[in-house]
Every structure is written in structure tokens, then in C-alpha cells.
């Protein structure tokens, strides 16, 4: 016999099913009558809805509110519209089997609802589980948090009723406060995001939260300091360090409960020691609202992009590598960056009249994608030449993550990981692979490129030079590590790791990776070609989207391993021939600055496999004042010979960034006129043949003249040209400056002997490289 509650339940279910059947029949009849439906049943006025919403209501009015509730937490209108379209597609994909369920629409509704739940409740939940940002906890900081008042009251009472606490009392209070940190974390896990998800909070709200967080940490650190200072023995360094270490842990627990990891927190989790200077800088960062805002904004942007990946917005035929919204945000930020560079100048501190546009300096630096590509190609060519001389062979390796790391095409194996986590996995595999080679005393060098699949998942291409006798062992170990995780899945051996032995008859080893460099920076020399990942994209557009993808996820696209220091190479190119008193530095300067020969430079530094400590030329630094976080800074001032201890200054001027004056162009023109008048007078000529303003005009002309044949000249080389009126560009060309004009001239043969002192063996090495290039 059924109980009363069971009978009531059955009656309710019967009434509900009858009501749903009536509504379904009305919907079916409306569809038969030309898809007409009663729009007065909509919760709001018809003008408040998009065409897809109206179509959705006409198709399935029974579940309309259920569907909209599922979609309301998606961060973008584009995503909500996308899922409405998918829902309608899933609804209409059900075939008519002649059943009553299909006639009433129940079968279609069930299939479409299950599809929507699978996407929004399963895939998105995998994303949300990785972000523990607690909005309720953050919003508590807008007013003084109750837990902070409680801790403050307890500390004041403890100070009021005790004069000098004993070590036992201090230990007790340490434990209480330490427990309070775990209490904060417990609060963070218990409270749920109720009203407004973190990824929907506006930027102005984030700034307010950042300010309140910084203010709360200032109060908390001050309260802890007042309480614990009585327990620190005077001049006892051990007690002081222990106090700051404990304060660091308390602050870390509070930040972790809010969903943020403070710097170096992984060392606490792994029970490792932290340097005192790292603790100090972290405690200062926690009191900086700008630091908090940057942390919140970065997490929010990556979370929104992660949701876009889970929703299928980043895929083929939609948006390759990065969502369209994030790509537009990146383009807008690039324009803002360029506008800032154009709005600023750099000024010589010692000579304020010498001013240069900051944007021009950007174009001359390695931040310029074109120059960065040129520099990488020079390095790769040098590595290849050095490998040929030392009988090393080239391997082209491709490393891809398992299928569970890929979100594309509704992959049910997807673990919910984002591109940054996949990059960390690839890094770990590569580190373990290098460790295996190191144990076998196998050394290798080369370069790797990280690029995305269509769904944003990164994969690697690597060019590796290895000794010929170890080539097969390197291939075996690489495949072993690449297939260590889920190596038995279908297609793993074919798609997840590829090894190609570079064939010189098909092209140089550098050519194997040159295309991947160009298509991930600026698409240079690839006009008319399309992307391998997305044939609808030109390689120029492909490069822009890849750069935006790398910026959003903080992924390093290019990395060399082995070889000599690139920073030393750049400083050598700033020097003038014969400027150094050290013979080795002068030889390296001739290789880097005149011959542009990276292989010869590596030979001087000890070869591609030399350790940094064994390379004779190193950077020379000067200590600068600490930054606002109390961290000591170092600035490059030149080069030094590690063994002879001789130094050379490559940066003779100190600059400061200033806002560009509104009359900068007019002042430039007037200074040109004054310079012209001064040059026609009987006064003695200054050390430079042009004024600062006229110099900027000549620099633009020099830039146009040298652009087809070399990289932009450094400031030191320009100074040399303006002082001595002649500068060697390469073995065949020089620049001459005459009467406020500059031109390219052919070098005289008798000048070839006036180069910086180069040993006979080094000259033979350079001639050998030249002959190899001609061949």
C-alpha cells in the first residue's frame, strides 16, 4: 500500500506531465501553422530578445527558461548566441522515428538538453575547478572584514594584559594565528560564488577590490608587527628572520583563501627554504594595489579565454588559436603601446638637448619583430656552421601533448587544462629528456619553437644538433619520453612525436625551422602562403594571432639552448672597432659587429657547448637603486673579460623617459636652422658635424640607407659616424658623412688592412665561413 507522500508525489508527476504534454501539443500545432506562437508568453517584451532567443522560444518554449538560466553565466553575448545555435542544431538533428515522443517533441528536447548539460555542466566545470577565486571573500574586503577585526581585537587584548610574553606564550599565539590561516582557507572552500562570477566583474570593480586587498594587508601586517615585536630579542637576527617567515606564511594563507598564490608560495608547499629578500619583496607586493590589480586582471583574462576554449569558440572554422574577442583586445593593446611609444621621448641626462623619440629606439631594438627574426636567423646560421665543422648532425623534432590536453571538437577525454598548463607539461617532458641525455654525457644544442594547434593547445618544433655517434640514442630517448604519458592511445606514435633527420640535399638544417620562425613572428617572405593549421589564414594574419595567443597565456615562443650568450653578442655590436683594450673582446667585436658571424663568435666563447662560467666574455653590470618592492636592480654597462678582468664600457650615456613636448617638431626645425647658421660661421666646429636636431634627420636617412643591407645602427656606431664622418658597415660598404648629408660608398682595398687587430688563425676561420656561404 502506498504511503500518503508517495501518492502525492505520483499525483504531482502526473499533473506535471499532463501540463507538459498540453504545452508540447500547442507548440507542435503552432509549428504546423507556420511556426506561429504566442509571444505574450515571453517573460519580457519581445524587443528585449535576440532573433535566436525568439527562435529558441518558438522551438522549445517549455525549456526556454531552463536554457537561459544555463547560459546566463557565460561571459560573452557571442558565446550565449553560439550555444543557442548549437542547441537548435542538436534539437533538429533528431530523426523522426514515428514515435509519440518525437511527435510531442520530448525526444528532441531530451537530446538537446542532455547535449547542453554535457557542455555547460561537464566541460565548464572542468574549467571552473581550476580557478579558486572566491568573489565573496574578495567582496568582504570592500568593508573591513569581520575576521580581520577579530584578529585585531585578540592581538590588542593580548598586548594589554601581558607585558613581555614568554617563548611559550609566543608559541601559543603563533599556533593560534597559524590556525586562523587554515580557517581562512576553509572559508574560501566553503563559500561559493553566488551572485556574480569572478570573470564577469568589471575592471573598475577589480581596481576597487585591489585597493581594499592592499589596504587590508597593510593593516594586518602592522597589527602583527605591533603584537610580535615584544617577543623579538634585541639584535637577534634569527628571531627577526623567523618572524618575517611566519608573517609571510600567514599572508600566504589569507591570499590563498581568496584564490591567489603569492610569489614563491610553491616553496612553502614543497617545504623548501625561501630567501629573506624574497620574503621582504613579497610582503611589500601584498600592500601594493597595482600588483593586486595586475594579478586579478591576468587571471580574469585567462579564465575568460579558457571558458571560450571550453565552449568551442577557439577551433577551426571559428577562431584559430585565440578567440576573436581576445585577439581584438590584444590588437587594441598593441595600438595603445605604440601610441605610448610615440608620445614619449628619451633624454640624455648629461645633455638634455639630446633627445630621441622612444618609438625610434623600439624599432632599433630586439623588441621589433623584424629585427628579432633577423637575429634568430643569424644565430641559427652560426649554429649550423659550427655543427658542420664539428661533425654534428641535425634532427628536427616535433613534440605534441596527449589527446586529453586537447579541447577541440568536443573531445570527451579533455581534462580541462589550459594552454599554459600544457606548456608546463611539454617543458617537464623536455627537462626529463635533457636529464636522460646528461646522464649519458650526450650534449646537444639548437632551438625550439612553441606554436598552437587550432584549439590553442601548444606543441613544439625543435632543431637539435647532436654528435653523429649518439644520433640513434637521442631519437630513442626522445620517443620514450614523448610517449611516456598515454603512449598507447590511438595515433600516439604517429602524431605525438615525430623525428626527421635533416637531409642536406633538400636544404640546410636552418631551412627546416625557418618557416616556423617566420610564421610565428611576422610572416616574412611568405606572401601568398597559408597556415598549415588553418588554410583560411594567410601567414601574416597567422603570425598576429599566434603572437596574441602567446601574450594571453604567457608562453615563450622561441628558445635557444646551448650556444654563446646572446646578450654579450648584442653588446659587442654596440662597440666600435678597436674600442676595447682586450684582444679577445676586439676579436669578438670583429666577428659580431663587422662580419656578423655568429659561428666565429661562438668559437671565441669556447664553442656551442661551453658553459657560461667557461666563456671568456661576460656582461658587466652596475648596481642601481632598489625598486619600489625593495629589490636590488642591475643594469648592463659594458663587457668584461672573465679571465684578464679587463673591461669596456658599451653604454656611455644615461637616458630617462619623458613625455614628448607638444612643440617637439617645431623645436627640431628651429635647431636645424641654428645648426645651419652655426656651420656657416667662422667658429670652430664642434666635436660632431651636426646638431642634435639635425642629427635626428640624418639618422632617419641612415636608417633608410642601411635597412636593405643590415640591422639599424646602435647609438655608439652613430656617435662614431658623426665624430669621424666614416663608418664601416661590412667588408664592401661604408657610410660617409659630408656637409649634413650621408651616403653609402664602396670601401677601398687599402682600408681592409686597417680593421681591428685579428689574429691570422681567426682570419682563416672567417675566410672559411665565407667560402662555405659561397658554396
UniProtKB/Swiss-Prot annotation:
State its Enzyme Commission number(s): 3.1.-.-
| Keyword Hydrolase assigned | yes
Q: Tell me, which GO biological process terms does this entry list?
A: DNA replication; viral DNA genome replication
Alphabetized, the UniProt keywords read:
DNA replication, Endonuclease, Hydrolase, Nuclease, Viral DNA replication
The keyword Repeat appears for this protein: no
Please name the catalytic residues of this protein.
512 (o-(5'-phospho-dna)-tyrosine intermediate), 516 (o-(5'-phospho-dna)-tyrosine intermediate)
Q: What Pfam families does the entry give? A: Phage_GPA
InterPro entries, alphabetically? Replication_gene_A-like
The UniProt GO MF terms for this protein read: endonuclease activity
Q: What exactly does this protein do?
A: Possible endonuclease which induces a single-strand cut and initiates DNA replication.
Give the family, as the similarity comment puts it: Belongs to the phage GPA family.
Q: What is this protein called?
A: Replication protein
- Identify the gene encoding this protein: rep
